[in-house]
C-alpha cells in the first residue's frame, strides 16, 4: 500500500495552540504510516522530527493568486492525499484545491463557531475605550446589532456555508459547537461532514503537587479577547484576604504596559509580570491555580495544560469549549458566570482558603486531562483520514 500524505497549511509555524495540535497529529499518524507536511508562510524554530516543513516563497500569500498556485503546485508535486486548513477560512484557496487537485479537503475550526463576529464585536469595544461618544455608539448600535439583531452573522454564515460545501470534512472542538454551527448555517438535520475532535494535551509524567501559593495567568495580553485587566481588578478585591499568595502573569502583548500601569495605580502588591516564555512548564509546576478572564475562548489550551500539571483552572463560563473542559464546576475546575468580578473573587478566595478542596480538584483535573491525550485524539484524526482515503 502506498504511503498516504497529509499537508497542513499554517501562516506561522510553530506559533500557538493550533500549530501544537498539528504536531501532535503528525506524531501520531506518522507512526502509522503517514507522511506529514506543513506548508507555512513563516517558519520559526522548533522540533519537526515527525514532519517536513516547507516554506512558501517570499511575498507569496495564500490570499492571493501566487500563493494559492504555490499550494496547488505543492499538492501536485508531493501527491498529497489530504489537505488540512486550520483556523483560516481562505475560500479562494479551498476552491482552487478543490478544482485543480484530487486531494481531500479538511477545514479545522480551532475556535468557537462564528468567532469572527465575536472578534469584530470586541475589537470595536476595545477601540471605543476612553472615548465617550464611541463607547456610547458601541452600546447603542454595535451591541444590539450584534447580540440581539444578529446583523453581522449573515456574511459569516455565507462564508461557512461555502466552506462546508467545498470540504470533505469540517472539524469542531465539541458537540455543542457542532450543534451551534449546524443551526447557524441552517443545516439542523444533516451535517455528516462535521466531525467533533477536541484538541490534544500531552500527559505530564511527573506532576508536582507541592505547589507554591501562586496564581497564574498564561497567554497573550490583549484587551479585545483576553481581558487580563479583569484579573487585575479581581486581585485588587482579594489580595489583602490572601496575604501569602502572589499573582504571576506570563505572556506579553499590546496591553502589557496598560496592565502594569493599572497595577501601579491600584497600589497592588505581589504581582509579577514574568514576560513571554516559550516553555511555561516551570510556571505550571509552581502554581496552584490558573486564572483566565477572557471574553471568549474556543478551546483554551492553557486550561488543559493547567489540568495536566495539576493546576486548578478557573474561568468565566463564556463558551461551550470552556464549559466542556471545566464542567462540572467544583470538580474539574471552577466556572464563573460571565462576567461577574465579584463572583469570581468570592469563588477564588473560597478555593484558596480550602486546601482540602484544592487537593481534591487537583486529582480530578489530572484525570480529566488524560481524556485529551495525544493518543486518544490522534486516533480520531487517524480514523477521519482513513475514512477520507477509502
What feature does the model see in each segment?
Residues 312-316:
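Short hydrophobic beta-strand element within catalytic cores of glycosyltransferases
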Residues 7, 206-226, 232-235:
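Conserved donor-binding/catalytic core segment of Leloir-type glycosyltransferases
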Residues 327-342, 350-356:
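Conserved acidic donor-binding segment of nucleotide-sugar-dependent glycosyltransferases
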Residues 283, 343, 357-371, 379-383:
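A short, well-ordered alpha-helix in the C-terminal region of glycosyltransferases
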Residues 276, 295:
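Aromatic "clamp/platform" in nucleotide-sugar-dependent glycosyltransferases that forms part
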Residues 129-170:
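Membrane-proximal helix-turn-helix segments that form the acceptor-binding/catalytic region
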Residues 19-24, 222-237, 254-260, 342:
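A conserved mid-protein helix/loop that constitutes part of the nucleotide-sugar donor-binding site
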Residues 85-91, 109-112:
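Short His-centered aromatic/hydrophobic patch
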Amino acid at each position: 500500500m502506498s504511503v498516504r500524505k497529509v499537508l497542513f497549511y499554517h501562516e506561522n509555524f510553530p506559533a500557538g495552540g493550533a500549530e501544537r495540535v498539528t504536531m501532535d497529529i503528525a506524531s501520531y499518524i506518522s507512526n502509522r504510516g503517514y507522511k506529514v507536511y506543513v506548508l507555512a508562510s513563516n517558519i520559526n524554530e522548533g522540533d519537526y522530527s515527525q514532519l517536513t516543513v516547507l516554506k512558501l516563497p517570499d511575498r507569496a500569500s495564500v490570499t492571493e493568486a501566487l500563493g494559492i498556485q504555490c499550494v496547488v503546485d505543492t499538492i501536485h508535486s508531493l501527491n498529497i492525499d489530504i489537505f488540512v486548513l486550520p483556523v483560516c477560512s481562505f475560500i479562494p484557496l479551498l476552491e482552487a484545491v478543490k478544482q485543480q487537485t484530487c486531494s481531500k479537503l479538511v477545514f479545522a475550526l480551532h475556535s468557537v463557531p462564528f468567532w469572527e463576529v465575536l472578534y469584530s464585536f470586541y475589537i470595536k469595544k476595545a477601540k471605543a475605550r476612553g472615548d465617550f461618544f464611541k463607547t456610547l455608539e458601541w452600546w447603542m448600535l454595535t451591541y444590539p446589532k450584534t447580540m440581539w439583531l444578529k446583523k453581522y452573522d449573515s456574511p459569516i454564515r455565507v462564508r461557512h456555508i461555502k466552506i462546508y460545501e467545498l470540504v470533505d470534512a469540517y472539524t469542531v472542538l465539541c458537540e455543542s459547537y457542532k450543534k451551534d454551527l449546524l443551526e447557524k448555517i441552517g443545516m439542523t438535520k444533516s451535517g455528516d461532514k462535521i466531525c467533533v475532535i477536541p484538541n490534544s494535551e500531552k500527559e505530564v509524567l511527573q506532576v508536582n503537587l507541592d505547589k507554591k501559593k501562586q496564581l497564574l495567568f498564561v497567554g497573550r495580553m490583549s484587551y479585545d479577547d483576553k481581558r487580563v485587566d479583569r484579573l487585575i481588578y479581581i486581585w485588587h478585591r482579594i489580595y489583602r484576604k490572601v496575604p501569602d499568595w502572589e499573582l504571576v502573569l506570563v505572556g506579553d502583548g499590546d496591553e502589557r504596559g496598560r496592565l502594569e500601569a493599572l497595577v501601579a495605580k491600584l497600589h497592588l502588591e505581589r504581582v509579577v509580570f514574568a514576560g513571554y516564555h516559550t516553555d511555561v512548564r516551570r510556571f505550571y509546576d509552581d502554581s496552584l491555580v490558573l486564572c483566565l478572564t477572557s471574553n471568549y475562548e474556543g478551546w483554551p489550551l492553557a486550561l488543559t495544560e493547567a489540568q495536566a500539571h495539576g493546576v486548578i483552572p478557573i474561568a468565566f463560563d463564556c463558551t461551550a469549549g470552556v464549559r466542556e473542559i471545566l464542567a462540572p464546576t467544583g470538580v474539574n475546575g471552577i466556572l464563573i458566570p460571565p462576567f461577574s468580578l465579584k463572583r469570581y473573587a468570592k469563588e477564588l478566595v473560597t478555593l484558596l482558603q480550602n486546601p482540602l478542596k484544592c487537593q481534591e480538584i487537583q486529582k480530578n483535573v489530572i484525570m480529566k486531562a488524560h481524556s485529551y491525550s495525544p493518543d486518544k485524539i490522534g486516533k480520531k484524526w487517524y480514523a477521519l483520514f482513513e475514512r477520507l482515503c477509502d
